[in-house]
Swiss-Prot record:
Pfam families: CsbD (PF05532). The lineage of its organism: Bacteria, Pseudomonadati, Pseudomonadota, Alphaproteobacteria, Hyphomicrobiales. It comes from Rhizobium meliloti (strain 1021) (Ensifer meliloti). It comes from the Bacteria. Keywords: Plasmid. InterPro entries: CsbD (IPR008462), UPF0337_stress_rsp (IPR050423), YjbJ (IPR026042), YjbJ_sf (IPR036629). This is UPF0337 protein RB0906. Belongs to the UPF0337 (CsbD) family.
């Protein structure tokens, strides 16, 4: 997984993140600014999911995406 590409294209990616994790606010997404660690933390906070599960969910989500870099 090349998370650096996600960080570098965050403005385009955050819409897909919002579709998957709708409880994240626009302010959350702006604050995350592409940081995987911050995304994990916000998902944990909003959904009450343990860290290992959040990591797996993000990996699964990332693998399902069609990226047009």
């Amino acid at each position: 997984m090349d998370w650096n590409r996600v960080e570098g294209n965050w403005k385009q990616v955050k819409g897909k993140v919002k579709e998957q994790w709708g409880k994240l606010t626009d302010d959350d997404l702006d604050q995350i600014s592409g940081s995987r660690e911050q995304l994990e933390g916000k998902i944990q906070e909003r959904y009450g999911i343990e860290k290992d599960r959040v990591r797996r969910d993000i990996d699964d989500w990332y693998g399902r995406q069609t990226w047009n870099w």
